[in-house]
Amino acid sequence: MPVVKMLKQVASRTLGSPACGCQPPTLPRRFLGTSPRQIPADANFHSTSFSEANQPRVLITGGLGQLGVGLASLLRKRFGKDNVILSDIRKPPEHVFLSGPFIYSDILDYKNLREIVVNNRVTWLFHYSALLSAVGEANVSLARAVNITGLHNVLDVAAEHGLRLFVPSTIGAFGPTSPRNPTPDLCIQRPRTIYGVSKVHAELMGEYYYYRYGLDFRCLRYPGIISADSQPGGGTTDYAVQIFQDAVKNGRFECNLNPGTKLPMMYIDDCLRATLEVMEAPAEALSLRTYNVNAMSFTPAELAQEVLKHIPEFQITYNVDSVRQAIADSWPMNFDDSTARRDWGWKHDFDLPELVTTMLNFHGAHSRVAQAN
């Protein structure tokens, strides 16, 4: 096939170029060689041209997790309801199903993922399918399959079809030997959870695909994300979500981390906006493939003190989970996100007082509605 022959010639010339000894050779931004997976000779996909001037066609994997539904809502407001496809392996609740396109997508099924991208003319892919820190430690084999094998499928499909790919990373990508206060973008990582290891793997594989295949890979290391309208998903920072629900409902909360455990945190609206902003940033503005982003850092005790300003009778007790505490003790206390602020203008809106007020107002309103019903 002439196209395959031409691509092999391009790859041969690229790989045969001499290196300078201290820096990798300058590579073209887009496709450099053959696809990471060979296309079967009998493959039969419908191909449709897509203009870069049009709105992106978006696919979100793992869309029923903490961030997917909110991201879909934000992107649909920006790009149109029908241009954003939410996907997961679970059955969506009715309000999600009715809010816009939803399809079944198993990231471990490479052929199915590829068909979805081609048949829906996808140009942007947000890859949110993952098992989080505490859940991953309880099921390492499943975490390895979802977080690593699934990532490989997504990377290959994205490279083959020239997608712009976003993969979130995490504070969990760092370990006990990393600088903790603050933690810069580039430093020793060496995490000690399968979740963290898989995220470092994702960061490095994405950067490799950027240089090797020209994949437009973009990644943010999220701090702990606090959201009002979703349930905790098995992460070490879940206490900072659960505390508001329990404070409004019961007036007390049992925390599974030590009172002095400081971790970086962010309200979900800031998180989703940062994700959209880095995806919309001009390619030439990005000096890194993976950026830290941050808003605030606090301890459980500091968060409880802020809650007490609104609910004076609130009580917090501590029953430390040794597994989660060990994970938290290996993570950054504060993120240095100065590069993101410099390169693409990142700026957070929510500090701790605004966060607490927003969360308590949300849960207070829902509690009053429930009582009325």
Swiss-Prot record:
NAD(+) binds at residues 62-67, 88-90, 106-107, 195, 199, 225. CDD domains: TDH_SDR_e. Pathway: Amino-acid degradation; L-threonine degradation via oxydo-reductase pathway; glycine from L-threonine: step 1/2. The keyword Transcription does not apply. InterPro entries: Epimerase_deHydtase (IPR001509), NAD(P)-bd_dom_sf (IPR036291), NAD(P)_epim/dehydratase (IPR051225). One of its GO terms (biological process) is L-threonine catabolic process to glycine. It catalyses: L-threonine + NAD(+) = (2S)-2-amino-3-oxobutanoate + NADH + H(+). It holds the Pfam family Epimerase. GO terms for molecular function: identical protein binding; L-threonine 3-dehydrogenase activity. The active site is at 195 (proton donor/acceptor). The keyword Metal-binding does not apply. SUPFAM superfamilies: NAD(P)-binding Rossmann-fold domains. This is L-threonine 3-dehydrogenase, mitochondrial. It comes from Sus scrofa (Pig). The gene is TDH.
